[in-house]
């Protein structure tokens, strides 16, 4: 099969993406062989590219996909050949920037019928991250009448997290943005209040007169952590998804703040007993998209998968100015 990978880790200038030919991996008992029609770019793509040196062949990135099931493993029960699926994959396996891809059915969902393949590929990773952060890491319940602060509301995770919080809970949603276009996008996603994270966020929150019980720190956690401790309710909860260089959480002791990480690959990496929860939530998100309850967060289709378009997608991701999601058409796209 054809695939796109890089040969040298490091900066984007060093990342020599090439198209090459490689074998299709063998199916495991719960695996699907998917013909890939759409992929997307996430921060994990650029993080891996900077840190992971390929070994015997170029490293294939890509942690979102939508496509058609072409073959199933012996124990597969959730899907059949010909089904259209979408998923975020497993960081321990080769990525989705290829003609075909192997994925466990337990972390795969039915593709939203209302979205194109490329648009559907922009949904899984951010939806899983947002869902797990909201309900597992923060422990929010449907009838919760508290408030949540989402730092970095205009990115891929923030865009879907705002919607999930508004549609599935009673939370008041405060989201941060720093530019006019990102502020407008966050408002479009449904945020009740918007603050500017280029200013001290504890002062911004104080001016609102709201003390959030929950904080979702999606970016700049090390920069904002002291302010988070100041603004959060006693016995509140903080969940983060970024990679702060150093974080002293002792300042949260007096308020008995609950602190947790969200990493959506945990279930697949460790094959947890509940990894099927990702299959279930992706199906629910798919239904919500098809019923108009959720809206797509995709803002740009960068064209067909190639070394050139991958480099452009990585450049945009690393600019720090991404709103929503960037997607690419797969090798099999007719566009």
Enumerate the predicted regions with their spans.
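C-terminal capping/lid region of NAD(P)-dependent oxidoreductase domains
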Residues: 290-300, 311-335
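Glycine-rich cofactor phosphate-binding loops and adjacent beta1-alpha1 units
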Residues: 142-143, 189, 194-262
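Mid-domain Rossmann-like dinucleotide-binding core that forms the NAD(H)/NADP(H) cofactor-binding site
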Residues: 123-199
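NAD(P)H dinucleotide-binding glycine-rich loop of Rossmann-like/cofactor-binding domains
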Residues: 88-152
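C-terminal substrate-binding/catalytic core of Rossmann-like NAD(P)-dependent dehydrogenases/reductases
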Residues: 251-301
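Short glycine/proline-centered loop/turn elements that form peptide/ligand docking sites
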Residues: 74-75, 175-185, 222-223, 246
């Amino acid at each position: 099969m054809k695939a796109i990978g890089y040969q040298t880790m490091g900066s984007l200038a060093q990342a020599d993406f090439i198209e090459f030919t490689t074998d299709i991996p063998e199916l495991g008992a719960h695996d699907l062989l998917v013909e890939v029609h759409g992929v997307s770019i996430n921060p994990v793509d650029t993080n891996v590219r900077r840190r992971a040196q390929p070994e015997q062949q170029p490293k294939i990135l890509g942690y979102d996909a939508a496509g058609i099931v072409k073959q199933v493993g012996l124990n597969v029960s959730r899907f059949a050949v010909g089904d259209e699926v979408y998923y975020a994959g497993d960081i321990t396996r080769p990525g989705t920037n290829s003609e075909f891809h192997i994925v466990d059915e337990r972390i795969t969902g039915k593709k939203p019928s209302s979205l194109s393949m490329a648009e559907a590929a922009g949904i899984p990773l951010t939806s899983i991250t947002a869902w797990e952060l909201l309900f597992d890491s923060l422990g929010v319940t449907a009838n919760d009448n508290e408030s949540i602060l989402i730092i970095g509301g205009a990115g891929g995770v923030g865009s879907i997290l705002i919607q999930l919080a508004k549609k599935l809970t009673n939370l008041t949603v405060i989201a941060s943005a720093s530019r006019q276009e990102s502020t407008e996008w966050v408002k479009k996603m449904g945020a009740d209040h918007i603050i500017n994270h280029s200013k001290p966020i504890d002062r911004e929150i104080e001016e609102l007169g709201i003390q959030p019980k929950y904080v979702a720190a999606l970016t700049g956690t090390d920069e904002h952590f002291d302010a988070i401790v100041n603004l959060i309710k006693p016995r509140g909860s903080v969940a983060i998804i970024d990679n702060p260089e150093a974080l002293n959480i002792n300042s949260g002791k007096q308020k008995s703040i609950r602190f947790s990480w969200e990493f959506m690959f945990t279930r697949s990496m460790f094959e947890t007993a509940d990894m099927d929860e990702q299959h279930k939530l992706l199906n629910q998100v798919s239904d919500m998209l098809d019923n108009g309850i959720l809206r797509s967060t995709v803002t740009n289709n960068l064209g067909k998968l190639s070394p050139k378009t991958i480099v452009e997608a990585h450049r945009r991701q690393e600019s720090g100015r991404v709103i929503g999601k960037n997607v690419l058409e797969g090798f099999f796209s007719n566009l």
